[in-house]
Regions:
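Glycan-recognition and catalytic cores of secretory/periplasmic carbohydrate-active enzymes
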Residues: 1-184
Length: 184
């Protein structure tokens, strides 16, 4: 995302090329794991996997590169990933990232209530992804997801008085989940 912004500010193609290069290395390095979304090349990815925050930021970067280059392989890949998230890995509250183990996306339709992780930071990343996809496609469905995430999955992470913070945002609690003091 930062390199795409730097390209937009400076007009220097090397920044956009560098952003695409970093993304294109996924699936081709010695580290080829799902946790870091490096299990296969980004243009072949079709499922949200691994660490949810890292994934969301990478998907936002993919949307930036897709929009700025017009690369149809990138556009199709990010569309497939978005369909997977919204259709199979998205909570009614707008949360993403079902499991505390690895702070990660779970399997398709793995959406527990009591142990839902739904990290606040993943919700922020999901807002970024949907904003960029709206700019890319101009379809309201992206803003529908953005708004649900913003008003239910993101804002819920902060207490009404601003003094407490939820790192994870489970859907169900029997009193065991408490907001932590603000990290500041």
């Amino acid at each position: 995302m930062a390199l795409a912004k730097l390209y937009l500010v400076t007009g220097d193609q090397k920044y956009l090329d560098q952003a695409k290069f970093f993304l294109d290395q996924r699936g081709y390095t010695s580290r080829t794991d799902e946790y870091s979304q490096a299990h296969k090349p980004v243009v072949q990815q079709d499922e949200a996997v691994g660490h949810a925050v890292r994934a969301a930021y990478m998907y936002a970067g993919m949307a930036d590169v897709a929009a700025l280059t017009g690369d149809t392989a990138y556009i199709h890949a990010i569309d497939r990933i978005w369909d997977n998230i919204v259709g199979k890995k998205y909570y009614i509250t707008g949360g993403i990232g079902a499991t505390a183990a690895g702070e990660a996306f779970g399997k398709n339709y793995e959406l527990p209530n009591m142990s839902a992780y739904c990290e606040t930071c993943a919700a922020i990343g999901n807002v970024y992804v949907n904003y960029r996809l709206f700019l890319l496609h101009g379809e309201s469905k992206y803003y529908d997801v953005l708004e649900r995430t913003l008003y239910n999955g993101l804002i819920s992470g902060v207490s009404l008085d601003g003094g407490g913070f939820f790192y994870p945002n489970p859907l169900e609690s029997m009193g065991q989940h408490q907001r932590q003091p603000w990290f500041g």
